[in-house]
């Protein structure tokens, strides 16, 4: 018997980065990690920057999302991401520099610094480094 699947889409303002059937989707919601199998209860959640993983036919695909929203209903998972990329698209050196910059901003404790923005930049950089490391091994 074939495994049940659900339609999964990852959409950014620039492109559709993924659109296919999948068995399982894992995202990082703002209130914690979420996993979706076919037939999941309808849900809408905001996403924090981090890894998004999709399982199809026993194989995992990883993406980095820079926040956004996920909607689950009628055996469909739609991710509307501010930005998203595949690990092979990531410039690891650039991500490491972005992480250093964000850490310096946060450590400076300058009242002029937008702390929320700096924390989001740090989370994005860490997720990009983590994803890039998965393909560099």
Curated annotation (Swiss-Prot):
It comes from the Bacteria. Pfam families: ATP-synt_DE (PF00401), ATP-synt_DE_N (PF02823). GO terms for molecular function: ATP binding; proton-transporting ATP synthase activity, rotational mechanism. Its main location: membrane. Belongs to the ATPase epsilon chain family. F-type ATPases have 2 components, CF(1) - the catalytic core - and CF(0) - the membrane proton channel. CF(1) has five subunits: alpha(3), beta(3), gamma(1), delta(1), epsilon(1). CF(0) has three main subunits: a, b and c. This is ATP synthase epsilon chain. The lineage of its organism: Bacteria, Bacillati, Bacillota, Clostridia, Thermoanaerobacterales.
């Amino acid at each position: 018997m074939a495994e049940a699947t659900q339609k999964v889409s990852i959409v950014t303002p620039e492109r559709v980065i993924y659109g296919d059937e999948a068995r399982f989707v894992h995202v990082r919601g703002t209130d914690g990690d979420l996993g979706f199998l076919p037939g999941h209860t309808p849900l809408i959640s905001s996403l924090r920057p981090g890894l998004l993983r999709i399982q199809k036919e026993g194989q995992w695909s990883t993406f980095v999302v820079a926040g956004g929203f996920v909607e689950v209903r009628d055996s469909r998972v739609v991710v509307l991401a501010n930005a998203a990329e595949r690990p092979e698209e990531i410039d690891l050196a650039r991500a490491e520099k972005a992480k250093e910059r964000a850490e310096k901003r946060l450590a400076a404790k300058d009242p002029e610094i937008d702390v929320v923005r700096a924390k989001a930049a740090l989370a994005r950089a860490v997720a990009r480094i983590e994803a890039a490391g998965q393909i560099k091994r």
